[in-house]
From Swiss-Prot:
Lineage: Bacteria, Pseudomonadati, Pseudomonadota, Alphaproteobacteria, Hyphomicrobiales
HAMAP family xref list: Ribosomal_bS20
GO MF term (any one): small ribosomal subunit rRNA binding
Entry keyword annotation includes Ribosomal protein: yes
Protein's recorded name: Small ribosomal subunit protein bS20
Amino acid sequence: MANTTSAKKATRKIARRTAVNKARRSRVRGFIRKVEEAIATGDLAVATEALKAAQPEIQRAATRGVLHGNTASRKVSRLAQRVKALSA
């Protein structure tokens, strides 16, 4: 339990930031899920559009510190690789 005023304030701030970060992470997961569903159905056009929508969301999450930059790049790269494989 926080004793000092500054520690209590820090606890409140952490709770707010955690809520925001959870929402952002959930949003990114939703975009990734849409790409994966499109890949599973084998629809190249839908998968490409979903990837175009997901990529900036994933990068934005990395910029905001929700995901590590390398993790975001890896996710985008692997999704793009799978979408590209549909066209082959």
